[in-house]
Amino acid sequence: LWTGNTGSLSTFVTSSSQSAASLNYYTNVYNEAAGDVQYAVAYGHKFGSGSVSLDNDDSSTLASKATYAQYKQLLLDQGDDKFKFYSGSTEDGHESDDIYIINVARARYKEKMDAGNWSVILSGSNQTFNFIDNSGKKFSDSVGKAGRIFNVGSGSLNLGTESEATISSLIDSNGRGYGKFYPDQGIIVLNPTAIHQTIGTSVDSGSNSGASVYEGITREGQNQFLLHEAIRGGGDFQARRTENVSTSHYFIRA
């Protein structure tokens, strides 16, 4: 999937030339300096936490609120107001006000990402954890306007062995789901609360002391950098793409 037709990405570079304004919404990640964009990371909050409020700056664009609304419009079905993840054993039982986004560049995944064949290691102050989807048999029980939907869990693809992929858990220690995977869109949506409950974080959380992400309203938090650092620290993002290629056969009788 990645540039050079490699299946594993181990170098994660951001660009100093990306505009400051766009960094309030997302961060492009490259395979090398002056390389190709591999994916973008973003943070969204339904009510705009993590961005400067209009009370503090009447020219604020409420970047985190706009990002949440953008992906809600792209991925959620009509009538769904929030992203939903596991709550204990109940699928979609937890409504999340905030989300992390990994949006793979279209030039990389082309038609769709290969469900069951991606993994990303996230590193934090606790330790490193590997995350995959729970597709297993390559089909999904859940299909929405954005196509197939799978849950994200900690686990292993067990590459190099005869074993199938294994899911260790779909939830954190408090019972909150890790995220969703939309292979037809090349998008992974993660639950920041569950992710940081598991991997931890040592990043300054600003005015919201003790939190995993900055939830204040006096400055632009650019919380997507927390996710970027977790991916960079993990040092391995594996993924494949898949395409349906149509062929036509003509039989000529002489």
Name these PLM-found stretches:
Residues 1-254:
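Long, position-biased, composition-driven segments near the start of the mature protein
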